[in-house]
Swiss-Prot record:
Its main location: nucleus. Belongs to the SCC4/mau-2 family. It is found in: Nucleus, Nucleoplasm. PANTHER family: MAU2 CHROMATID COHESION FACTOR HOMOLOG. TPR repeats lie at residues 453-486, 493-526. This is MAU2 chromatid cohesion factor homolog. The keyword Nucleus applies. GO terms for biological process: cell division; chromosome segregation; maintenance of mitotic sister chromatid cohesion. Required for association of the cohesin complex with chromatin during interphase. Plays a role in sister chromatid cohesion and normal progression through prometaphase. Transmembrane segments: none annotated. Signal peptide: none annotated. Keywords: Cell cycle, Cell division, Chromosome partition, Mitosis, Nucleus, Repeat, TPR repeat. One of its GO terms (cellular component) is nucleus.
Length: 632
């Protein structure tokens, strides 16, 4: 064959490739898309025996189309594996990286574990060292998988490598993304000092070395979300306020109508084509951390208002595109609203929303959300069971929570609630054992100020029940000191009402009144029906002692009102189909459509153990500020 004939044949083949690719794209973008004909066009390319690079790219495109538009995962895998085997040895050919990234995603969808996905990405990371964009993208993808598997040290190491690679390429924006992502992992690991150092370093770069004002604002939102979560994890509700206010202002700036699209901000430079979350999702996340703050500060009305706004926004986004992270946000918000309902005495609504959270978890592919949130759901059902006097069920729920979770704050929270159960059921040996264990485990380790305040509160409650009033006062004053320092209003109100009861028990009616009055004011502001029930009983006794008949009548009337509200709500709980969830201890939670099966006491407790402070735990991996539960 002459050179001219060979050239003519090659040109003719190129024209065929281009025509078939153009036709395939035409069918793909038709309304509606004609995927069958699109695939036929791509398949036809192979009949021309194309060069290796064209063949590999076509196999990649086939894999992409099959994954995006069909359920034929096996065929998609075959094409992607073929693309990988052809492209892997070819130098300076990006198709291998795109293929590895997609194959890893496919392995995560279909395999029981992530070993193959990790192996594929590790190989691609090795091959991509001369391509900064793909090297960084693959490092982020691999670190995300390790983080999802709770292999935080490995995730952190990969993110550190990414920060170095971005730094060597003078990609400052990308470097800050890696630094902040690593700070998020270290926060989950409770490496408090390392988190602070990274946040300080990233903050200085954002302030001084990011010239693009739009990218700067995005990084600022990421930075402030982490800073707010850091303070909330420490239980520092008062300290966090300036950062939270700044975050709320920044998100308003980003959501303004004149703000450019994400594509316009991040589309110009390949090394800036990385976004932590699109602005619409950031908007929901800011609502979420605001809800977290309101819950911890004891502003239930605010928490409910922001939760409802966030859930509305999530539903709008789901209608556009149902991203998995929206379900994560929804579950965390539902966990918060459940806690609000129980503090306010709306337990029937709480169990309904626990069921809603269960439904979101069950709908996620491969039960991934249920695995991550099962312990939290058991904890919430434990709180619900406590509030309806089902102590045996509550105990089993908390024990399951402790056995399932690796989150130390959630474990501490569940154990403190177990201590309350043992106190109320007079199991002194179990109570002593759990308090000793909690004390030993948390003496020399980092814990939330709110949680540690709750620990002192439980010890004060225990001392009160032993009639060790001096010891009770000592523990409760320590609790008050911690609560007042950070505006933990519910912890404050519960401590004040218990202190009031301590003083009442030793006959000091003046100090008792001095404690119960601000407790009731705070409880009304929260509002916390359990503290109000308890406080009204104390006020009734105090007014009777001082022979103030009218105020005694008023206090008694209030006490009856709170009691009747709780009794009416408990009747609704018993009648709710979702009440059956109290019997879920293992496996998948039941679908609650049948009649309730558990008999429940209808008389609410008004004893001093009926209400204990809200304590918030920390987030699950890669999900900032996921908070769990309150004591009862």
């Amino acid at each position: 064959m002459s050179a001219s004939t060979s050239t003519s044949t090659a040109a003719s083949q190129d024209a065929c490739y281009i025509s078939l690719l153009g036709l395939a794209e035409y069918f793909r973008t038709s309304q509606p898309p004609n995927i069958k004909k699109c695939i036929q066009c791509l398949q036809a390319l192979f009949t021309f025996m194309p060069p290796s690079k064209v063949e590999a790219r076509t196999h990649l495109q086939m894999g992409q189309i099959l994954m995006a538009y069909t359920k034929n995962i096996d065929l998609a895998r075959q094409h992607l594996e073929k693309a990988w085997s052809i492209s892997e040895p070819l130098p300076n050919f990006d198709v291998k990286f795109d293929t590895a990234s997609l194959l890893a995603q496919l392995h995560l969808q279909t395999d029981r574990n992530s070993h193959q996905a990790k192996a594929m990405l590790r190989r691609a990371v090795e091959l991509s060292q001369n391509n900064v964009y793909w090297h960084c993208k693959l490092l982020l993808q691999l670190s995300q998988i390790h983080a999802s598997d709770r292999e935080y040290s490995l995730a952190s190491e990969l993110l550190a490598v990414g920060a170095e690679s971005a730094d060597e390429a003078s990609a400052t924006y990308l470097k800050v993304l890696f630094l902040l992502s690593r700070a998020m992992i270290l926060m989950i690991e409770r490496k408090t000092n390392d988190v602070l150092a990274l946040l300080n370093s990233a903050g200085q770069i954002i302030d001084n070395n990011i010239p693009n004002p739009h990218q700067k604002e995005y990084l600022k939102v990421f930075f402030l979300v982490l800073q707010v979560c850091y303070y909330l994890a420490l239980g520092q509700v008062k300290t966090v306020k300036p950062s939270l206010k700044q975050l709320q202002m920044s998100i308003q700036t980003i959501m303004a109508p004149n703000w450019p699209s994400d594509e316009a901000i991040f589309g110009a430079n390949q090394l800036e084509m990385f976004v932590w979350l699109p602005k619409e999702q950031l908007y929901v996340l800011v609502y979420l951390v605001t809800v977290s703050h309101s819950m911890m500060a004891g502003y239930m009305d605010k928490a409910q208002k922001y939760t409802e706004k966030a859930l509305t926004q999530i539903e709008k986004l789901k209608q556009q595109e149902d991203k998995p992270i929206l379900s994560v946000f929804k579950v965390i918000l539902l966990e918060h609203i459940v806690m609000c309902r129980m503090v306010m005495g709306n337990r029937e609504l709480a169990i309904r929303e626990i069921a809603a959270a269960r439904d979101v978890c069950m709908a996620a592919p491969q039960r991934s959300l249920l695995r991550r949130h099962s312990a939290q759901l058991h904890c919430l059902i434990g709180l619900y069971s406590m509030s309806t006097n089902l102590f045996e069920h509550a105990e089993r729920q908390f024990v399951v929570c402790v056995s399932e979770t690796s989150e130390r704050d959630l474990k501490l929270f569940a154990n403190l609630n177990l201590a309350i159960i043992y106190l109320r059921t007079k199991r002194d040996t179990d109570l002593k054992q759990i308090l000793d264990a909690v004390s030993t485990e948390n003496t020399h380790t980092y814990s939330s100020q709110a949680l540690m305040g709750g620990f002192y509160y439980v010890q004060g409650l225990h001392a009160f029940h032993k009639n060790s009033f001096h010891e009770a006062k000592r523990f409760l004053r320590e609790t008050l000191k911690m609560a007042n320092a950070e505006d933990l209003n519910r912890l404050t109100s519960c401590s004040l009402v218990l202190l009031s009861h301590v003083f009442l028990s030793i006959g000091n009616s003046k100090e008792s009144m001095n404690m119960v009055t601000p407790a009731m004011q705070l409880a009304s502001k929260i509002p916390d029906i359990h503290v109000q029930l308890w406080g009204s009983a104390i006020l009734k006794d105090l007014h009777r002692m001082s022979k103030d008949v009218q105020h005694e009548k008023d206090a008694y009337a209030n006490h009856v009102k709170y009691s009747e509200n709780l009794i009416a709500d408990q009747r609704k709980c018993v009648q709710s189909a979702h009440h059956e969830l109290v019997n879920w201890f293992q496996g998948d939670p039941p679908v609650t459509s049948g009649p309730p099966a558990v008999p429940v006491l209808l008389m609410p407790e008004s004893s001093v153990t009926a209400s204990v402070p809200v304590i918030a735990s920390t987030s699950a991996a890669m999900q900032p500020a996921g908070q769990y539960g309150q004591f009862y």
